[in-house]
Amino acid sequence: MKNLILILLFTLTITNCDKTKETPLLLPTAAEPSAKLHNNQGIEYFNKGDYLEALIQFTQANVADVTTGEIYFNLGLMQHLRGNHEQAKILFKQAHQFANGNKKILESKLIEKHLDP
């Protein structure tokens, strides 16, 4: 139910999107298979502009694997796009925590924007 409410809020606020140059990240080769599947589907939907379905798929990827930084980055990106910067900040902190050396996460200008005081 909580996810449904988040999805509905996302839908209502998508028109207030802040454009960004960053795009969702692929998962590492060794990532949990169902997490990779949902993440890849999320990226496809993101690229088609279907941000609601992308959010759903990234959320499902996170359910399958809670230790992959790329998933948190992708969820943070979605929250950033909907203007929910406090939630994006929380997710980007988790992305950093689970980055495992991924420079796209560690050197992300978008993450820096949210994490800098």
Model regions: which residues?
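Helix-start (N-cap) detector for alpha-helical repeat units in TPR-like alpha-solenoids
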Residues: 28, 34-36, 69-70, 103-104
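Bacterial Sec signal peptide processing site at the extreme N-terminus
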Residues: 17-30
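Canonical tetratricopeptide repeat
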Residues: 40, 74, 107-109
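Conserved structural position within tetratricopeptide repeats
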Residues: 60-63, 97
